[in-house]
């Protein structure tokens, strides 16, 4: 793509060229190269029409490019699983089961494509607590109970722990002023993706990156950082046809008005507002309900996974529970 292909008035383009030459001292040909590079970066991928998304005619929405959750009930809700393109957000209160679902997807990604996996590993970026390795090991041991559709010999042959790459990030100051996250997303993650070592990127949680370090008056700077961060995620997802899963926190809702970006029935709303919501392609909400369900010698608080918005999914939900082997939908 060339700079002249952008929909700008010719006088504006000419003024930009003159100003760049004056401010930088570059030659006219160098300025032209700079503008071409900027135009290419700003619009690396063409926009995707919503009609094509609904028809499933775009790369990340092809039926063979879905990442299974590992549960038929939840896969039915998501029409096969997570699309292998764009940002999927799972938000919810503490203890709702968001991290449980993320860990389960990290394991599901390692199965061959015939079992609705991605035949590759995952990158897991922790921004709050330490990585829940003990729970991961339990999920690995119980895979044969969860994935009854997969031959036990195949499950035992997979080295799940060796293909989950864990990155720790503390806060936004460290991430952006010292380039910790930027180095991770612009160097290490693309290298793993290019080598085929990973095919899933998880950020747990995105809200922790932006809520602690900004006051209310810093909303403009926070918005810029959010857009920069999400732009990097979108680029990785589109470049490598990779699902990106972002765990998000929630905030209380005090308004009685109907919020189309919120869950079907809840007094909370995903954090980070409209700026972040506009970057998300699929928004899911996990809620912890009243009551418990029992199975054998196990019991679990009842949860519900809801589709808040998605270009290819109806607003719907399924009850679920967290067992030793992972998150399963509850048949009602």
Where do the PLM segments sit?
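Phosphate-binding/switch region of NTP-binding enzymes
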Residues: 224-227, 231, 235-332
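The Walker A/P-loop phosphate-binding site
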Residues: 10-11, 15, 19-24, 30-151, ...
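Conserved, well-folded catalytic cores of nucleic-acid-processing
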Residues: 37, 41-44, 80-81, 93, ...
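Amphipathic alpha-helical transducer elements in NTP-driven molecular machines
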Residues: 71, 84, 99-100, 133, ...
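Conserved inter-motif catalytic segment of the P-loop NTP-binding fold
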Residues: 117-220
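Conserved beta-strand elements of beta-rich interaction domains across eukaryotes
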Residues: 95, 129-130, 171-173, 207-208, ...
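Short, intrinsically disordered, charge-balanced linker/junction segments flanking boundaries
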Residues: 3-16, 175
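Hydrophobic/aromatic beta-strand patches that form the interior of the parallel beta-sheet core
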Residues: 88, 123-125, 165-167, 245, ...
């Amino acid at each position: 793509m060339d700079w002249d292909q952008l929909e700008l008035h010719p006088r504006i383009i000419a003024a930009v060229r003159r100003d760049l030459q004056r401010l930088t001292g570059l030659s006219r040909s160098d300025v032209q190269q700079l503008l071409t590079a900027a135009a290419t970066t700003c619009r690396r991928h063409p926009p995707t029409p919503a009609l094509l998304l609904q028809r499933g005619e775009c790369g990340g929405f092809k039926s063979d490019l879905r990442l299974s959750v590992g549960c038929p009930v939840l896969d039915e809700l998501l029409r096969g699983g997570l699309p292998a393109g764009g940002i999927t957000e799972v938000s919810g209160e503490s203890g709702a089961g968001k991290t449980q679902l993320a860990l389960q997807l990290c394991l599901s990604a390692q199965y061959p494509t015939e079992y609705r996996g991605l035949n590759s590993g995952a990158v897991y970026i922790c921004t709050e607590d330490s990585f829940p390795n003990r729970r991961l090991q339990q999920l690995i041991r119980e895979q044969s109970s969860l994935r009854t559709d997969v031959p036990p010999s195949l499950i035992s042959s997979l080295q799940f722990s060796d293909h989950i790459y864990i990155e720790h990030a503390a806060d936004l100051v460290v991430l952006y002023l010292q380039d910790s996250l930027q180095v991770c997303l612009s160097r290490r993650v693309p290298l793993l993706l290019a080598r085929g070592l990973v095919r899933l990127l998880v950020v747990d949680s995105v809200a922790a990156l932006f809520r602690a370090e900004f006051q209310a008056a810093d909303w403009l700077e926070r918005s810029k950082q959010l857009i920069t961060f999400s732009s990097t995620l979108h680029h990785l997802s589109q470049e490598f046809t990779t699902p990106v899963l972002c765990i998000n926190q929630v905030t209380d809702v005090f308004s009685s008005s109907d919020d189309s970006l919120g869950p079907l029935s809840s007094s909370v709303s995903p954090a980070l507002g409209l700026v972040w919501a506009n970057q998300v392609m699929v928004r899911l909400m996990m809620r912890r309900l009243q009551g418990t369900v029992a199975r054998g010698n196990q019991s679990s608080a009842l949860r519900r996974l809801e589709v808040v918005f998605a270009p290819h999914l109806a607003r719907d939900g399924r009850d679920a529970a967290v067992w030793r082997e992972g998150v399963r939908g509850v048949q009602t």
